[in-house]
A protein has these predicted regions:
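Catalytic cores of Mg2+-dependent Asp-rich isoprenoid enzymes
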Residues: 1-182, 186, 190-316
Length: 316
């Protein structure tokens, strides 16, 4: 069992202010994520916002316009800051609110901070312009930038006392992170191409005649772009099916949070599957009312119960 502490006996005003900053960053920069974590009790919601704010800082360095050498130096500076957080060397009156909040969160919850080192490693792969020949290659990258986030989040959520199979929770959290990241990659195909990045495996691109890349609102001439998208959608669905085994291992509100976030991405996947070329015309997204429905469904436990029934059928 992975146990999470529900609350600290006292949270000082400077720490609360630091958390407030992180929650503002989360609300402004990650609406899907923010929709999910609003279902959590305050201590867990604050800790998740601290994780997001630190992760966002790392991502922003990688996505910025600085030279590669400067990005690398800044990422290593961020890793040094993480070392200070890990050692508990960030005081609550430090001028960096993200470091203050993350240090407090790591004291309250058993967060495996090494996952943030993995995230930095993954962004360094972006900075170096690495491409991926096979799914196994891409999977390694996805584990760094998304699977690690799943395992970090599990440190905040914890598992339900007595949950059967709880020892596999980190594995399921990792797999669910991969499912979310592959969905992101499909959604952002054109945006990434405009930035000179291609994440889909070269083997898959060649198989469906898409090696020329995606530089406009139409697929490469003569390609089977729909076939490529449907192939990757099936892969993502298999990852979701495995990752959703995490839900019955969590308490009700943590399970609702995960179900809401994952549910939003599953519905994005549905939209992409119905209209593959939509990802070349612009960013596919869900309207607020649909996100609200997903959140209610997650809070009701419908997704967790559905996954539990499927797990029982597989074991039968």
């Amino acid at each position: 069992m992975i146990r999470a502490v529900e609350s600290a006996p006292h949270v000082s005003a400077p720490v609360l202010a630091a958390y407030g900053y992180c929650e503002a960053v989360t609300g402004q920069q990650a609406r899907n994520f923010a929709y999910g974590i609003r279902l959590l009790p305050a201590p867990k919601r604050r800790a998740m916002s601290a994780l997001y704010a630190f992760s966002r800082r790392v991502d922003d360095i990688g996505d910025g316009t600085l030279d590669g050498d400067v990005k690398t130096a800044r990422l290593e500076d961020t890793r040094a800051l993480l070392d200070r957080v890990r050692a508990g060397e960030v005081d609550e009156d430090d001028t960096d609110p993200v470091a203050v909040a993350l240090t407090h969160a790591a004291r309250v919850f058993p967060i495996p901070l090494g996952g943030l080192d993995e995230l930095i490693d993954g962004v360094l792969m972006d900075v170096r312009g690495e491409t991926y020949e096979t799914w196994d290659d891409l999977r390694t990258y996805c584990r760094c930038v998304a699977g690690a986030i799943g395992r970090l989040s599990l440190g905040v959520f914890g598992t339900e006392p007595g949950a059967r199979g709880a020892e596999r929770a980190p594995e399921y959290a990792d797999t669910l992170g991969l499912a979310l990241q592959l969905t992101n990659i499909l959604r952002d195909v054109r945006e990434d191409a405009a930035g000179g990045r291609t994440y889909l495996p070269a083997d898959d691109l060649a198989k469906f005649g898409c090696s020329a890349g995606f530089d406009g609102p139409r697929p490469p001439e003569g390609s089977d772009f729909a076939g490529l998208v449907h192939f990757e959608v099936r892969r993502a669905r298999a990852l979701f099916a495995e990752g959703y085994r995490l839900l019955p291992l969590l308490d009700r509100r943590s399970g609702a949070c995960v179900a809401a976030m994952a549910g939003i991405y599953r519905r994005l996947l549905d939209r992409i599957e119905r209209d593959p070329e939509a990802v070349l015309r612009g960013r596919v997204s869900l309207p607020g009312r649909e996100k609200a429905y997903v959140a209610v469904r997650g809070l009701s436990g419908l997704d967790a119960r559905h996954v539990s029934r499927l797990a029982v059928r597989r074991q039968a």
